[in-house]
């Protein structure tokens, strides 16, 4: 579950919104505005920096209201394992229900965070894609270094498989076998697999 080789889009242009506060207008970036409604958006590679921001947002929402639901929207190719696990552990620590939504794609650590939401509150949009696989890791250095790195990768692999098995209710052996290669699923297939609970179908507009 290493970071993807795909180029990462730059987030240099952050939209701002104008809000009427009753004491005049106030400008804020879109992510801060979403946070007011307890919405967190993970739309990039999951790095240490991204994880630190998401963890800080989660802790802030816990302090603000420890019982009210949090909503996490995910459109990510994945990222660093330890970064994703930092977010995962914080999600489990919060105590409140966490709704997760896949929009676009949730791959690798993105898929793990998607399925880590509160059971019954894990969603995907109809055209989203979900992918699971085993952690990647290049090894190098002395023979001792290689042995230690290989051992760490195996430990992470076992830990991630256990998390996924617990979240999906799939047998551990099936998770291990399916994720030996990139294993892609549609939203409906992800529901059948147990990664999510519902496929969100937009309501048709009536005229």
From Swiss-Prot:
Species, as recorded? Protochlamydia amoebophila (strain UWE25)
Instruction: Give the family per the record.
Output: Belongs to the peptidase S14 family.
Q: What is its main location?
A: cytoplasm
EC id: 3.4.21.92
Cell compartment(s), UniProt: Cytoplasm
> What's its catalytic activity?
Hydrolysis of proteins to small peptides in the presence of ATP and magnesium. alpha-casein is the usual test substrate. In the absence of ATP, only oligopeptides shorter than five residues are hydrolyzed (such as succinyl-Leu-Tyr-|-NHMec, and Leu-Tyr-Leu-|-Tyr-Trp, in which cleavage of the -Tyr-|-Leu- and -Tyr-|-Trp bonds also occurs)
Q: How does it assemble?
A: Fourteen ClpP subunits assemble into 2 heptameric rings which stack back to back to give a disk-like structure with a central cavity, resembling the structure of eukaryotic proteasomes.
Q: List the disulfide bonds.
A: none
Query: Which branch of life, at top level?
Result: Bacteria
Q: What is this protein called?
A: ATP-dependent Clp protease proteolytic subunit 2
């Amino acid at each position: 579950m290493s970071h993807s080789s795909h180029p990462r889009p730059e987030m240099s242009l952050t939209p701002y919104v104008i809000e009427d506060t009753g004491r005049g207008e106030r400008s804020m970036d879109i992510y801060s505005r979403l946070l007011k409604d307890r919405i967190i958006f993970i739309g990039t590679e999951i790095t240490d920096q991204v994880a630190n921001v998401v963890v800080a947002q989660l802790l802030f929402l816990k302090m603000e209201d420890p019982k009210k639901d949090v909503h996490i929207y995910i459109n990510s190719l994945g990222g660093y394992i330890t970064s994703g696990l930092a977010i995962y552990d914080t999600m489990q620590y919060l105590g409140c229900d966490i709704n997760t939504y896949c929009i676009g794609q949730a791959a690798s650590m993105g898929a793990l965070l998607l399925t880590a939401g509160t059971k019954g509150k894990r969603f995907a949009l109809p055209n989203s894609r979900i992918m699971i696989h085993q952690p990647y890791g290049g090894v190098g250095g002395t023979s001792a270094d290689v042995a230690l790195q290989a051992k760490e990768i195996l430990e992470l692999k076992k830990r991630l498989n256990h998390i996924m098995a617990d979240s999906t209710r799939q047998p551990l052996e099936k998770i291990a076998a399916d994720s030996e290669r990139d294993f892609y699923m549609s939203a409906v297939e992800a529901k059948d697999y147990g990664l999510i609970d519902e496929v969100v179908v937009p309501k048709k507009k009536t005229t």
